[in-house]
Amino acid sequence: MSKVGSSLYSRLHGIFKESSIATAKSAKPRSQTKSTKFPSKLKASTASVGDGGQSSNDAKDSKNSKLTQKVEKFKRSCESESFRQVHGLYSAFIRRLREAKKFSTIDEVLQYQKKFDDIKSEDFVIRIMLLYGYSGMAEHAHKLFDEMPELNCERTVKSFNALLSAYVNSKKLDEAMKTFKELPEKLGITPDLVTYNTMIKALCRKGSMDDILSIFEELEKNGFEPDLISFNTLLEEFYRRELFVEGDRIWDLMKSKNLSPNIRSYNSRVRGLTRNKKFTDALNLIDVMKTEGISPDVHTYNALITAYRVDNNLEEVMKCYNEMKEKGLTPDTVTYCMLIPLLCKKGDLDRAVEVSEEAIKHKLLSRPNMYKPVVERLMGAGKIDEATQLVKNGKLQSYFRYLPDLSAGKKKTTSSPVSSSAKTTSTPVSSSPDTSSFLLSLSLAADSSSSDSDSSSPDSSSSVSSSPDSSSSVSSSPDSYSSFSSSPDSSSSVSSSLFSSSRENSSSPDYSNSVSSSLDYSGSVSSSSDYSSSVFPSANSSSSSSGLLDD
């Protein structure tokens, strides 16, 4: 790779060169907190109550029938032009299908969109491509990209960038690089800064410093200047690898370019410090952030909560949680997925129930490890009514997404170990078969077990994070549950721009928000972002898709 006279390139080259040994040492996989898998007991439970295997088959047939009804209802809703403009409705529906691994159904729903004139709009096609990408179906996105001329839809650098993002979010990084190298010249497309930012993110995930340097060299050679997103992506990677010296040099380099750090920049640094248990430094940095006029957000507090949770420090976790609420911030799914199991682990069942009810009240998108420990401990303590009420409340909000094991007469064991100081004795559940069956029937039947999922998806082999942007996904962080955390800063702001429903009654389609500008993870709109911003509603989204997703 040839050297150029660019001061930016030279300085980056020096930073990367000095960190190459450290990078190699730190590239080993981070130890992850193993998340307990809770296999669905639906079949076993129904078999014990009903007619054996026949009951299980009937339940499966019933679930498939309900899914078919929902899909048909969604298709009918798509006939409305105003419905097609509300991005969040599509995103929420596809998210549910993806979590249930219904890949063929995802393809059916997205293919159905070709019947509308909107398909001639590049922005509308981009939305579909991104939904494919976040479902781990990048090959489908590429096929749609190839079909655009036949659909009388113009192909520009915007749809090309969406294709790259589809590969990146499907974790098919080699294919993304191949597409980046081959298609622009073949199709006469000139890459822009969004293109380069997307590839910087892909290469950071891959851990290829030499290739990142090549991208920066090409970027400058073509007359572009790295923006805040370019540097934030690098900062996230260096601090994730705990390369603080090199990360701080990137920080200084960014400021020398007259780019002021934003909330995402600070959050990357805070996460790096808390992962290394440098709590005092992290708190001091937050104070500096405040003096710069930048207020901590939910993700700042989540970084602190994550670190304190690893140390089983419930007192500090609750302090952060309460301070967050005092400042008018609404805890998100990540917050509750860390807090609720920790409360159960410490034996504080009453407060765990209280916090669970609060999460349900906020209509948060839940995860299997979020409420299950509470329900199991309530059942283990013989508090059948409270367990029933908790499940019912979640069911009414359509946000319970697990099938707890509430088999009759079975001794309950906790999903997470109880500390010796707060250990409680589990007692056999004396609920009758009818009670168990009733509680199971209250649970949302969107089971993602392999027996009910599509295994034929051509792209389903790739692991897809729950949240679209996984530049700092759980796979790289030992402090997060594998079922939820991804881009730490992408959840709170997306709905305000990409998925605003204020245009629902508009007389003409407007898809510009999905492509004309992308979100930096802090929520500030940047004209030169990448397409890594979430297509899905935020974790705090209260949209229930007008009942389309209700069971």
Curated annotation (Swiss-Prot):
One of its GO terms (molecular function) is mRNA binding. Disulfide bonds: none annotated. InterPro entries: Pentatricopeptide_rpt, PPR-containing_protein, TPR-like_helical_dom_sf. The keyword Repeat applies. Transmembrane segments: none annotated. Residues 22-67, 409-435, 449-551 are annotated as: Disordered. Residues 58-67 have a biased composition (Basic and acidic residues). Residues 415-435 have a biased composition (Low complexity). Keywords: Repeat. Residues 29-48 have a biased composition (Polar residues). PPR repeats lie at residues 121-155, 156-191, 192-226, 227-261, 262-296, 297-331, 332-366. Pfam families: PPR, PPR_2. Belongs to the PPR family. P subfamily. This is Pentatricopeptide repeat-containing protein At3g13150.
